[in-house]
Curated annotation (Swiss-Prot):
It comes from Shewanella woodyi (strain ATCC 51908 / MS32). Prevents the cell division inhibition by proteins MinC and MinD at internal division sites while permitting inhibition at polar sites. This ensures cell division at the proper site by restricting the formation of a division septum at the midpoint of the long axis of the cell. GO terms for biological process: cell division; regulation of division septum assembly. It comes from the Bacteria. The keyword Signal does not apply. NCBIfam families: minE, PRK00296.1. HAMAP family: MinE. This is Cell division topological specificity factor.
Amino acid sequence: MSLLDYFKSSKKPATAVTAKERLQIIVAHQRGERDAPDYFPQMKQEIIEVIKKYVHIDPEQVSVQLDKNDNKLSVLELNVTLPEKS
């Protein structure tokens, strides 16, 4: 083992791994939106408005995704980060 091998790290920095995971999520999200029906953006906005009637949320904390599989089955996935109870 040389002195240079000692300073080289075989592990990727945690920030690089986190950035890679985030990029994969963004790419998957954009692919999902590309295949979404024309009414999807309006439906997403209306869902956010309904949630805002009951809970104060940041629209950026709402994720709506439409997934399709080979059996022509569509799944609407909704993830909302709700505020903590005060």
